[in-house]
Amino acid sequence: MTVPAATKASDCKPGFGCVTNLPLPRFVSLKGDEGNARRGPGLTHRIDWVFLRPGMPLKITAEYEHWRRVEDRDGAGGWVHYSLLSGVRNVIVTLDMAEFRETPDLRSRVLAQAEMGVIARVLECLPDWCRISVEGEKGWVAKTALWGVAADEVIE
């Protein structure tokens, strides 16, 4: 079997995908209503998991041709075709009644709260906080209450 030059391990930079040359791991979101996670990168591989939440954040950990190895916040996952994924940045709230604040400061006024499991759009992130949006509500939430962004990630 011949391996395409773009996927040879020797051609890959550490910490970057061999196919896209984008950082690994990185976060994306589920594009449609459902996405099959397969045991291996191809349609002939068994479906191990089905993601059913539109916009769900997923972590890409590997790439092979048109396939991306992804996992959810619980570590469940598999290989998903890249067309089922979006670069739109979303997070999932991991703390019950996470507080949306007016500014990225614990002394700031609480504008709203979100239940655990809510999926939110990322508007921007600082080292310890992200400004997110859910159903028209916007506010700053501590990163420790979110999954879908790296601890040190800054998003403008």
Mark where each language-model region is.
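SH3-family beta-barrel domains
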Residues: 2-39, 50-54, 61-64, 71-76, ...
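Beta-strand-rich domains and repeat architectures in extracellular enzymes and scaffolds
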Residues: 46-47
